[in-house]
């Protein structure tokens, strides 16, 4: 991918502004998950070790522009960065018009979404960001799909704009998995609604050899194939769309395997009685809440033969133990596979954590919405801007 990389630049004595994704959950001043902070450390350390004067900013939550609030302040993040790096990390509240920072020093710049014009990608604000630095580094893949002043405008205005190690690792992995995959390519797409994954499904069906669906999405495909689904979650108005996707797959010689058995209950509650049924035996008051054991074994066998696996979404209500087996079998199959595997999406990450297979997945994307848009085949604004600057 044609993007200037931070790691290829001489940074000694340079003022370097790094846009990170430090949007961590905070409860009463306490950070409850520091995954994104940990992920940012290698980039920051490289810049410091190379003698740069380092400024880091990020968004946190959705503050009102032009209004500082303690609730949306990066103060807890500054404190944690200081502890992890073993250096003082001062937080600068008013920084748009200038920041004092020396080579080898790190300062954290307050929540960039508090700045008026950030969300609208205001050019004047972007130029002020650019004036702060000799080198701007975009390292926040999780916000690469948003055209904002700190993720897009500044890239266009900065003297030098580069991709940070975290961003480039994400793009390299996604390109390997989707743009230049070793075949066969298998995708797992779960979730409650076809409508939220329609562009994703439509893009993947043109690239994969197998497309496994789960959750309410699979129910819609079952209904499209003429199977009864009882009172299960599905989208009647997208049955024809599901049929069109199946037709595209068949025309390419690709496969969208449907469940042959499922796990059902009468109510959507933890602790209810779970029953395995074949898909042609569903009655009016059944709720399909997981794939059945026969289907899980079949899908696991398909995963075993894949060379590249892309996973987004569970195949059942894995939060309830009675309906977690399908997702567990697939998670363990992906983990055991020799394929290059990419997983992303909040529920997917939760499943990976639940079954303890993170170390066996080739790449876990923390990108959220940016990950989904990449899977949909969309061009991410920040990535497009970095590519334009590399020329």
Swiss-Prot record:
InterPro entries (UniProt xref): Phosphoglycerate_kinase, Phosphoglycerate_kinase_CS, Phosphoglycerate_kinase_N, Phosphoglycerate_kinase_sf
SUPFAM superfamilies in UniProt: Phosphoglycerate kinase
Pathway participation: Carbohydrate degradation; glycolysis; pyruvate from D-glyceraldehyde 3-phosphate: step 2/5
Primary enzyme class: transferase
Domain of life of the native organism: Bacteria
EC number: 2.7.2.3
Residues engaged in binding substrate: 21-23, 36, 59-62, 113, 146
GO terms for MF: ADP binding; ATP binding; phosphoglycerate kinase activity
Cysteines paired by S-S bonds: none
Keywords from the UniProt entry: ATP-binding, Cytoplasm, Glycolysis, Kinase, Nucleotide-binding, Transferase
GO cellular component, one term: cytosol
Catalytic activity: (2R)-3-phosphoglycerate + ATP = (2R)-3-phospho-glyceroyl phosphate + ADP
BP GO terms, sorted: gluconeogenesis; glycolytic process
Assembly, per entry: Monomer.
Family under the similarity heading: Belongs to the phosphoglycerate kinase family.
Entry protein name: Phosphoglycerate kinase
């Amino acid at each position: 991918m044609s993007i200037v990389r931070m790691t290829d630049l001489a940074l000694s004595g340079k003022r370097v502004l790094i846009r990170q994704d430090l949007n961590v959950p905070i409860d009463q001043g306490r950070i409850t998950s520091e995954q994104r902070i940990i992920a940012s450390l290698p980039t920051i350390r490289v810049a410091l070790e190379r003698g740069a004067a380092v400024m880091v900013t990020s968004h946190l939550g959705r503050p009102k522009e032009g209004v500082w609030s303690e609730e949306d302040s990066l103060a807890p993040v500054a404190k944690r960065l200081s502890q992890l790096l073993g250096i003082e990390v001062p937080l600068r509240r008013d920084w748009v018009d200038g920041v004092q920072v020396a080579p080898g020093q790190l300062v954290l710049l307050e929540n960039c979404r508090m700045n008026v014009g950030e969300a609208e990608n205001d050019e004047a604000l972007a130029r002020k960001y650019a004036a702060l630095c000799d080198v701007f580094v975009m390292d926040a893949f999780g916000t690469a799909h948003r055209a904002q002043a700190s993720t897009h405008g500044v890239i266009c205005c900065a003297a030098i704009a580069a991709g940070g190690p975290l961003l480039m690792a994400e793009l390299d992995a996604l390109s390997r998995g989707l743009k230049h995959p070793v075949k066969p390519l298998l995708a797992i797409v779960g979730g409650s609604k076809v409508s939220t994954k329609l562009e994703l499904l439509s893009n993947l069906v043109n690239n994969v050899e197998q497309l496994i669906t789960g959750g309410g999405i699979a129910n819609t495909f079952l209904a499209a194939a003429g199977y009864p689904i009882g009172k299960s979650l599905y989208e009647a108005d997208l049955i024809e769309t599901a049929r069109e996707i199946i037709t595209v797959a068949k025309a390419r010689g690709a496969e969208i395997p449907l469940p042959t058995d499922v796990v059902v209950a009468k109510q959507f509650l933890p602790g209810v009685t779970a029953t395995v049924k074949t898909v042609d035996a569903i009655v009016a008051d059944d709720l399909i809440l997981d794939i059945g054991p026969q289907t899980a074994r079949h899908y696991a066998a398909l995963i075993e033969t894949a060379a590249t696996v892309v996973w987004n979404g569970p195949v059942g209500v894995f939060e309830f133990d009675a309906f977690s087996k399908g997702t567990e079998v697939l998670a363990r199959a992906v983990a055991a596979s020799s394929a290059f595997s990419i997983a992303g999406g909040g529920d997917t990450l939760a499943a990976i954590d639940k079954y303890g297979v993170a170390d066996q997945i080739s790449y876990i994307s923390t990108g959220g919405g940016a990950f989904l848009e990449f899977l949909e085949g969309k061009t991410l604004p920040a990535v497009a801007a970095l590519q334009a600057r590399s020329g």
